[in-house]
Amino acid sequence: MEVENFTDCQVYWKVYPDPSQSIYAIVPFLTVYLFLFFLGLFGNVTLIYVTCSHKALLSVQNIFILNLAASDCMMCILSLPITPITNVYKNWYFGNLLCHLIPCIQGISIFVCTFSLGAIALDRYILVVRPHSTPLSQRGAFLTTVLLWILSFVVTLPYAFNMQMIEYTEERICGYFCTEKWESAKSRRAYTMIVMLAQFVVPFAVMAFCYANIVSVLSKRAQTKIRKMVERTSALESSCAFPSHGLEQYENELNEFLDKQEKEKQRVVLQNRRTTSILVTMVVWFGITWLPHNVISLIIEYDDTQSFFRLYGRDDYDISYLLNLFTHSIAMSNNVLNPVLYAWLNPSFRQLVIKTYFGDRRKSDRIINQTSVYKTKIVHDTKHLNGRAKIGGGGSHEALKERELNSCSENLSYHVNGHTRTPTPEVQLNEVSSPEISKLVAEPEELIEFSVNDTLV
């Protein structure tokens, strides 16, 4: 008789169908999850491969980004395939051991992901807002990532410990499901609130605070830089009195310089706007992708009658699984966007990816060297300007031209730096007044801004 009952039993989703099993739901979600799986895995594996292939890229910031990419890969492998299967078929096919292990690893990867986003925001905050404080070292970054994994494991441990594989008790239903089984509903709800705070509220608050301050500081520095360029231009216009006997090229050089200064101002404004947009996107995207999933989980947790998501009070109109799939897929889109926001938008990294996969490896090494040399050169050039060769010839016309150029250069340097500075005799007007002058006479805070912007964008 027992054999007959077992033979006649059916799986849960056939006895209690719901909208998540509709072909109109399965096909779109299958497409979305396949897209998130392959694109997320490709993006994060590429990020890890390119960064680890070039030791010069193992900076403090990139160590945290590597940590983020590793957790994203874990979510792509474990959360993206398994969660939709269990939501649609309401059955656990992976055995008792994996009932404890897979949810544990899923939880750890999610916590490491959100904790890493908070760590990246804090590191950038210290670099930009508190530039004179001691920055985190590579060793400190590695220790921080280890602590993040340990903390994630500790927070996830109660969840994994209380997971159990339970057999369906109804006679006509056969199969098992893997679910939480706590001693009391009170303890389960308390843990749910802790998870929501640790996984969403705290990281979101940290990111919002850090990036709001970074945007404020970078905007002020951009305004200061533009103001200095305006003062520099005014000083040059008032200092350079060109002779009226046919030296029109001087006026052409001045006009050319003014055009370059105007383009440089526009570049600073656009770069600041772009950086602001990226930082705001990071915070907003994290909020809109993780908030719905947390809200749905919270409602399900406190819905004792399990009727909140039942339309018309009917079991076959229970949309809780459908909503859970929808919000989960939105949350998992972070796996695709994180490599884009934190790596691909960096032009240097983008070139490295292209050169690594499609070009000469030596060219990608040169990109790294050029980036590091460029940042070093900014600081070095504040102490010394390398001029070109003197203008040759000893005629009166050439001598007059040289005196006028030197006079403009001396007056310009005085107005820019706020104190008398003897320029290198070889430096000419069209060299001193190039767009790079804003970097050559930049304050320490401005230099920090350039290097941090390289990291941000």
UniProtKB/Swiss-Prot annotation:
GO process terms (BP): behavioral response to ethanol; feeding behavior; G protein-coupled receptor signaling pathway; negative regulation of protein secretion; neuropeptide signaling pathway; regulation of muscle contraction; response to oxygen levels; sleep
Annotated phenotype, changing T83I: In ad609; clumping behavior
Membrane topology: Multi-pass membrane protein
TM helices/strands, residue ranges: 23-43, 63-83, 101-121, 141-161, 194-214, 280-300, 325-345
Tissues where the protein occurs: Expressed in neurons, including neurons in the head, the ventral nerve cord, and the preanal ganglion.
Subcellular location(s) of the protein: Membrane
InterPro entries: GPCR_Rhodpsn, GPCR_Rhodpsn_7TM, NPY_rcpt
Entry GO terms, CC: axon; dendrite; neuron projection; neuronal cell body; plasma membrane
A Pfam family recorded for this sequence: 7tm_1
Topology feature Extracellular, residues: 1-22, 84-100, 162-193, 301-324
MF (Gene Ontology): neuropeptide binding; neuropeptide receptor activity; neuropeptide Y receptor activity
UniProt topological domain (Cytoplasmic) ranges: 44-62, 122-140, 215-279, 346-457
Keyword Thylakoid attributed: no
Disulfide bonds: C99-C178
PROSITE patterns named in the record: G_PROTEIN_RECEP_F1_1, G_PROTEIN_RECEP_F1_2
Keywords carried by this UniProt record: Disulfide bond, G-protein coupled receptor, Membrane, Receptor, Transducer, Transmembrane, Transmembrane helix
Free-text function comment from the UniProt entry: G-protein coupled receptor for FARP(FMRFamide related peptide) neuropeptides. Activated by FARP neuropeptides flp-18 and flp-21. Plays a role in modulating social and feeding behavior. Required to modulate locomotion quiescence during the sleep-like state called lethargus, which occurs during molting between larval and adult stages, in part by regulating touch sensitivity.
Family classification: Belongs to the G-protein coupled receptor 1 family.
Name recorded for this polypeptide: Neuropeptide receptor npr-1
Species for this entry: Caenorhabditis elegans
